[in-house]
C-alpha cells in the first residue's frame, strides 16, 4: 500500500473504518457476514452502507438467491483509494509521535 496520505473524515468513525477494512480484504462480501463480524444491527449497518454508497466508496448488489434477497457489498476503486490514503495518514500521525 503506497497511497498518498489523506485523512478521510467519512471513513474515520470506528464503525465505518471497521466496515471498510473488512471490505478491503475481500472482493464481494455478504451483508450478514459484515453484520455478524462487527456485531451491528441490520438498521445500523444499512445506515453506514447508505453513507458509504452515497460517497461512492462501496457498491451494493442485491441478487436473488434461492428466492431470498441477499445483499452483497464491495469496496469500489474510489473506496479502496480513500481507505489506503486514510491508513497512510494514520501511519504518519503515529510515526510522528514515535520520533
Region roles according to the model:
Residues 49-50:
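Short, hydrophobic-biased segments on the C-terminal half of alpha helices
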Residues 56:
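Glycine-centered, phosphate/nucleic-acid-interacting loop/turn motifs that mediate DNA/RNA or nucleotide
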Residues 2-44, 65-74:
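N-terminal helix-turn-helix DNA-binding core of bacterial DNA-binding proteins
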Residues 60:
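Short beta-strand "wing" residues that participate in macromolecule-binding interfaces
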Amino acid at each position: 500500500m503506497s497511497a498518498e496520505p489523506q485523512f478521510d473524515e467519512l471513513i474515520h468513525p470506528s464503525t465505518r473504518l471497521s466496515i471498510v477494512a473488512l471490505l478491503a480484504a475481500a472482493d464481494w462480501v455478504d451483508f450478514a457476514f459484515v453484520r455478524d463480524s462487527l456485531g451491528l444491527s441490520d438498521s445500523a449497518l444499512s445506515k453506514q452502507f447508505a453513507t458509504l454508497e452515497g460517497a461512492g466508496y462501496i457498491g451494493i448488489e442485491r441478487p436473488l438467491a434461492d428466492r431470498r434477497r441477499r445483499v452483497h457489498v464491495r469496496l469500489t476503486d474510489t473506496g479502496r483509494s480513500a481507505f489506503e490514503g486514510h491508513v497512510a495518514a494514520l501511519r504518519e500521525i503515529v510515526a510522528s509521535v514515535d520520533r
